[in-house]
Amino acid sequence: MKVLWVALVITLLAGCQAEVEPEPEPEVQLGREWPRWQGSQPWEQALGRFWDYLRWVQTLSDQVQEELLSTQVIQELTVLMDETMKEVKAYREELEGQLGPIAQETQARVSKELQAAQARLASDMEDVRSRVAQYRSEVQAMMGQTTDELRGRLASHLRKLRKRLLRDAEDLQKRLAVYRAGALEGSERSVSAIRERLGPLVEQGRVRAATVGTLASQTLRERAEAWHQKLRGRMEEMGTQARDHLEEMREQLEEVRAKVEEQGSQMRLQAEAFQARLKSWFEPLVEDMQRQWAGLVEKVQLAMATSPTSAPIENS
C-alpha cells in the first residue's frame, strides 16, 4: 500500500490540481487506457504498480473488500500519511539545498511551489482516508444486501482518479525536464558569465602588452607577458572551479537518483510482503471451504448409496 502513497507524493509535488472534473465520463474498462502511459523511471513504474493494485482490489469479492476496509487498514493509512509527509518534508529540504547556487528569486519561487504542493498533498491524503472510511461505513450498512451500486460508484471514482493520475504524471514529466534543463542551463550560464568577465580583461592585457612591447624595452615586454600569463592562469583556475562545481552538482544528482532507486526497491519489497500477507489470510479459508465441500459431497454419495437397501425393510 506504500506504492499508493508514493505515487500520490510524486504527482502532487509537481503542483498538479487536485480537483476532479464534475462532468460525466464514458464507461471505460479498467486497464484499457493504461498502455499509453509508459516509462522507465522508478517513479513511473511505481505509478503503474499503483494502478494495477487498485484494479486488483476492485476485482475482489465482497468479503475480501470488507477485510481490506477494516479498521486496521484505516490505521495503516494514517501511519502511511505521517510517513509520507516526513518524506515530503525531507525531499523538499534536500531540493532547496540543491537549488542553493540558483538566483534567490528562482529559489523562493520553487520553495513556494513545493510548500503549496505539500499542503495539497496533506489535504488530498486526508480526503482519500475519509473516502475509504465512508465506503467502509456504507458496506457495513448494506451487509446482506447487494453492493452493485457501491461497486459502480467505486469504479467511477477509480476512472476519474486514473484520468487525473495520467494528466498529473505527464505534467510531472514536463516539470522534471524543465527543472533539470534549468539546473544545467544555470551551471553553463555561470561558466559563460566568468568567461565574459575575464574576456575583456584578457583582451585588455594583450593590447597593453602589445603597446608596452612597442614603446618600451624588453624588460617591460617580459613584465607584460608575466602579467598576461597571470591573468590567463587566473582565468583557467576560475574555469576549473566552475567545472568542479558542475561536476559536484552532477554527483549530487546521481546520489539523489540512487536514493530514489533504493527507496523504490524497498517499497516494492514491502508491497510484495503485503501481497503475501493477504494471500496467507485467504488461503486457509479457501482450503477449509474445499474440505467442507468434499465432506458434503461424500455424505450425499453415502446417503444415495444406502437409500435402496432401506426401502425393502420398511415394506416387510
From Swiss-Prot:
GO term, biological process aspect, one: cholesterol efflux
GO function terms (MF aspect): cholesterol transfer activity; heparan sulfate proteoglycan binding; heparin binding; identical protein binding; low-density lipoprotein particle receptor binding; phosphatidylcholine-sterol O-acyltransferase activator activity; phospholipid binding
Residue span of region Specificity for association with VLDL: 277-289
Binding site for heparin: L161, R162, K163, R164, H228, Q229, K230, L231, R232, G233, R234, M235
GO CC terms, sorted: chylomicron; extracellular exosome; extracellular matrix; extracellular space; high-density lipoprotein particle; intermediate-density lipoprotein particle; low-density lipoprotein particle; multivesicular body, internal vesicle
Subcellular location: Secreted; Secreted, Extracellular space; Secreted, Extracellular space, Extracellular matrix; Extracellular vesicle
Protein task: APOE is an apolipoprotein, a protein associating with lipid particles, that mainly functions in lipoprotein-mediated lipid transport between organs via the plasma and interstitial fluids. APOE is a core component of plasma lipoproteins and is involved in their production, conversion and clearance. Apolipoproteins are amphipathic molecules that interact both with lipids of the lipoprotein particle core and the aqueous environment of the plasma.
Name the record gives this protein: Apolipoprotein E
Source species of the chain: Orcinus orca
Upper lineage: Eukaryota, Metazoa, Chordata, Craniata, Vertebrata
Name of the gene encoding the protein in the UniProt record: APOE
